[in-house]
Curated annotation (Swiss-Prot):
Disulfide bonds: none annotated. One of its GO terms (cellular component) is Golgi membrane. Keywords: Glycoprotein, Golgi apparatus, Membrane, Signal, Transmembrane, Transmembrane helix. One of its GO terms (biological process) is protein secretion. This is Protein kish-A. The gene is TMEM167A. Pfam families: DUF1242 (PF06842). InterPro entries: KISH_domain (IPR051523), Ksh1 (IPR009653). It is found in: Golgi apparatus membrane. The chain crosses the membrane at residues 54-71. It comes from Gallus gallus.
Length: 72
C-alpha cells in the first residue's frame, strides 16, 4: 500500500524526511539554504523543523521505531 494512504507509513516518511534534511544541512548548510522558497523550500523547512524541534523529533522517531518493531 502507498505511504499516502497508510497513516503510519506517511508519518514514517515525514519523520525520515525531517531527519535526513536536518542531517544534510548539518553537513552542507549552503546546499539547503539557497532554496528557501518554492518547491525545494520544503527541504529547507524540514531541516529547520529538525533543528529547532529536535527533542520532539527524536521522541517521535523512538516511538515510531518501537511501534514498527513491536506493535506490527
Amino acid at each position: 500500500m502507498s505511504a499516502i494512504f497508510n497513516f503510519q507509513s506517511l508519518l514514517t516518511v515525514i519523520l525520515l524526511l525531517i531527519c535526513t534534511c536536518a542531517y544534510i544541512r548539518s553537513l552542507a548548510p549552503s546546499l539547503l539554504d539557497k532554496n528557501k522558497t518554492g518547491l525545494l523550500g520544503i527541504f529547507w523547512k524540514c531541516a529547520r523543523i529538525g533543528e529547532r524541534k529536535s527533542p520532539y523529533v527524536a521522541v517521535c522517531c523512538v516511538v515510531m521505531a518501537f511501534s514498527i518493531l513491536f506493535v506490527q
